[in-house]
Amino acid sequence: MSDLFDGELYKKFFEVVGSPEEGKRISQAKAAQALGYSGGVISAYKSQAYNGDVKTLEKKIAAWLKREERRLDRLDVPVAETSALEKIRRAVTIAQDEGDIAVVIGDSGTGKTTALRQYAKESHSAILIEVDPSFSQVTLMNEIARAIGVDHKGGQNAVVERVIESLTGRDAVLIVDEADYLSDSSLELLRRVINDKSKTGVVLVGLPRLEFKIRNLKNDHQQLQSRIGVLVKLGKLKKADAISIIAGVWKGVPTQIFDTFIQTANGSTRTLVKLMGRVHQIMGLNKANTPDAEIIAEAGELLMR
C-alpha cells in the first residue's frame, strides 16, 4: 500500500463498508453520503487511486468510524407491554372490526408513535402513515397509495379511485400518526374516501389539538365528529409501565433506582427512553455494571425536561 494511505484505517474502514454480499454492514454509497463525498471518491480510495486530499478524507473517515462505533453501542430499549400500547391496540381493533373511526390523543412523549409502530409490526393488515406539516391532500393520498401498493402517478382523482378500489373489501385499517398536522380538508378526505367509500377503519393519532380541531364547530367537521366511535386519551407514563420499560434492560435493580428513573423522566415515555440511553453511555464510560442514582442524575442533566 502507498505511504499516502493509512493502512490500518483503510482496513478498518473496508471491514465495515462494502456490498451486503460481502457481509458488510454499510454500502459504499451510504458511507460516501455520510462522509459528504461522491461514490466515485470512495471507489477510488478503495482501489488506492484517489488523487485528492487523502489526509482530509482519512480524518473524516476516522471521525465517522468512531461515531459508528458509538451508534452500535447505543442502548436498544425493548418495546414493553404498556397500558398505552394496550389502549392503542384496543382502539385500532375496534376501528378495524367495525369499520369505524378512532381518535387517539396524547401529549408529546407519551409513547404514541412507538406503540403504533409496534402494532403495525405485529399486525398483517394495519397500514401506518406518518405525516408531517408539509402534507397536502395530494401528498396524503399519494402516501396511502404507496403504502398499499397501488400506482400513485397521475391526477388526484385517478389516485383516489385506485385507493378506493384497492381498499374496498380488504380487511385493513389505516392508522395516521401525527394527524394533528393535517388540514381540515385532508381530515375530511380521509373520512369520505377511506372510511365512507372504501368502508375501511381509520385511526387518527396526534396531540390534544387534534381533538380540538375536530370539535371546532367553525370548521365543517360535524360529519367527522359524528363518525368517531372511539376516543382514547393517553396520560402521563404510569409507574408500572415505567418499571416494565426499565426492567426490560436492567433486571433486579433496587426500588429506589426505579423511583429515581421515574422521577427524572417526569411522566414522559420518550424522556425515560432517552434517559436510559444516556445512562447506558455513562455506565460504559465508568465501566459500571448497573445504574445508580449518581449516574442517573448526571444523565438527567443532559436532557431537556
Region annotations inferred by a language model:
Residues V79-Q96:
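Pre-Walker A adenine-sensing motif
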